[in-house]
């Protein structure tokens, strides 16, 4: 429903107003986010938003391709983002057993913010991530809508854009197996032996890869990297500290932190 609402909003704005496509897309994205937020309120569960994070980018690119058409380069960019979205959605589905489950971070925010939680829920859990992901997918959308030409250096970043979700998937499987064993402590299997947050590292890599592939195809416009930079800041200053703080409750965390890189 949110996706359909977003597409309707985009078409409605384009038909009635002469805004630039970037602004029209942003308005439609925010409108869809409001729909998701309303459902999260109805179900009393902010985790309703989580799959929107992974569905939003491929849908935006697919709509752009349907309206504008695309070169092989544009379709490969879309395929990389679609692969990323499928991996992230599959991991969410694996963890989300029912509406009784809610991400621990949202539960923590609700406990800490009290009566202000509805505002924090909308601005912090729903709107802010939507804006970050919008900025992340904007470079690839620009490639499609402006018909940017492929350049040889783009091949490197396209390869990395496929590698990032591949390694994220590997990290997911390793973590799921560790949790099934129920041995407690810290996961030190595979990628987790080298990094405390390999999934976050690959998420950062993913959007720098998409951003840089688009950056070089579009004559090195620096603003195209704003999304990758914002996404990196989100993980470095919010996601990683929150996860480490939660892990710090376990015995031996200080030693584990010394032995294992953050990313």
What are these language model-derived features?
Residues 40-49:
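Membrane-helix interface "capping/anchor" motifs
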Residues 48-59, 101-124, 185-192, 262:
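Juxtamembrane helix-capping/reentrant segments at transmembrane boundaries
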């Amino acid at each position: 429903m949110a996706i359909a609402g977003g597409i309707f909003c985009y078409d409605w704005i384009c038909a009635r107003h002469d805004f630039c496509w970037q602004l029209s897309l942003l308005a439609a994205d925010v409108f869809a986010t409001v729909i998701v937020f309303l459902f999260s309120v109805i179900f009393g569960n902010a985790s309703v938003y989580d799959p929107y994070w992974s569905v939003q980018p491929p849908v935006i690119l697919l709509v752009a391709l349907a309206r504008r058409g695309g070169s092989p380069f544009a379709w490969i960019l879309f395929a990389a983002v679609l692969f990323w979205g499928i991996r992230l959605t599959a991991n969410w589905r694996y963890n989300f057993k029912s509406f009784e489950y809610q991400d621990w971070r949202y539960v923590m925010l609700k406990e800490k913010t009290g009566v202000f939680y509805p505002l924090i829920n909308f601005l912090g859990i729903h709107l802010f991530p939507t804006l970050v992901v919008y900025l992340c997918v904007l470079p690839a959308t620009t490639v499609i809508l402006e018909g940017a030409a492929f350049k040889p250096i783009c091949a490197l970043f396209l390869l990395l854009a496929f590698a990032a979700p591949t390694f994220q998937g590997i990290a997911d499987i390793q973590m799921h197996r560790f949790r099934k064993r129920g041995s407690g402590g810290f996961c030190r299997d595979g990628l987790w032996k080298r990094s405390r947050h390999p999934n976050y590292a690959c998420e950062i890599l993913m959007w720098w890869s998409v951003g840089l592939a688009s950056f070089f195809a579009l004559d090195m416009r620096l603003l195209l990297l704003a999304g990758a930079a914002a996404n990196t800041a989100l993980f470095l200053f919010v996601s990683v500290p929150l996860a480490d703080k939660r892990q710090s409750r376990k015995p031996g965390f200080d030693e584990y932190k010394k032995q294992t890189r953050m990313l």
